[in-house]
Curated annotation (Swiss-Prot):
<dbReference type="GO" id="GO:1990904">
    <property type="term" value="C:ribonucleoprotein complex"/>
</dbReference>
<dbReference type="GO" id="GO:0006412">
    <property type="term" value="P:translation"/>
</dbReference>
<keyword id="KW-0699">rRNA-binding</keyword>
<comment type="subunit">
    <text>Part of the 30S ribosomal subunit. Contacts proteins S5 and S12.</text>
</comment>
<protein>
    <recommendedName>
        <fullName>Small ribosomal subunit protein uS8</fullName>
    </recommendedName>
</protein>
<keyword id="KW-0689">Ribosomal protein</keyword>
<dbReference type="InterPro" id="IPR000630">
    <property type="entry name" value="Ribosomal_uS8"/>
</dbReference>
<dbReference type="GO" id="GO:0005840">
    <property type="term" value="C:ribosome"/>
</dbReference>
<keyword id="KW-0694">RNA-binding</keyword>
<dbReference type="GO" id="GO:0019843">
    <property type="term" value="F:rRNA binding"/>
</dbReference>
<dbReference type="InterPro" id="IPR035987">
    <property type="entry name" value="Ribosomal_uS8_sf"/>
</dbReference>
<dbReference type="Pfam" id="PF00410">
    <property type="entry name" value="Ribosomal_S8"/>
</dbReference>
<comment type="function">
    <text>One of the primary rRNA binding proteins, it binds directly to 16S rRNA central domain where it helps coordinate assembly of the platform of the 30S subunit.</text>
</comment>
<comment type="similarity">
    <text>Belongs to the universal ribosomal protein uS8 family.</text>
</comment>
<dbReference type="InterPro" id="IPR047863">
    <property type="entry name" value="Ribosomal_uS8_CS"/>
</dbReference>
<dbReference type="GO" id="GO:0003735">
    <property type="term" value="F:structural constituent of ribosome"/>
</dbReference>
<keyword id="KW-0687">Ribonucleoprotein</keyword>
């Protein structure tokens, strides 16, 4: 079966694993999923990311992060730009998530960036998701 929205699938897998407090999850690899996983690691939402090469497309293994009392670090994920309705932001209109407590993931001409990085590089683009 062909997947119509692999980014939404990635976010749903992270959300589901997080809700049942799994330590790790594996998703089929793609370039954009790899970049999103790196942003989540860099911003402190997940502990680590590994890339496993297999005979097909490869696997991204993500290790989720939890607080001292096993509380979730990721409290919410939301897909913004969808295949049926694309959402774009200009460089001066890059959204803030929960007044800076969360991040927006934006696909720009300079690669996939967090909202903070996009503001620093003055880059706009497609708003892929919010994570808080």
């Amino acid at each position: 079966m062909v997947m119509t929205d692999p980014i939404a699938d990635l976010l749903t897998r992270i959300r589901n694993a997080n809700m049942v407090r799994h330590e790790k999850l594996e998703v089929p690899a793609s370039k954009i999923k790899r970049e999103i996983a790196e942003i989540l690691k860099r911003e402190g939402f997940i502990r680590d990311v590994e890339y496993v090469e297999d005979s097909k497309q490869g696997i991204i293994r993500m290790f989720l992060k939890y607080g001292q009392n096993n509380e979730r670090v990721i409290t919410g994920l939301k897909r913004i730009s969808k295949p049926g309705l694309r959402v774009y932001a200009k460089s001066n209109e890059v959204p803030r998530v929960l007044n800076g407590l969360g991040i927006a993931i934006i696909s720009t001409s300079q690669g996939v960036l967090s909202d903070k990085e996009a503001r620093a590089k003055q880059a706009g683009g497609e708003v892929l998701a919010y994570v808080w």
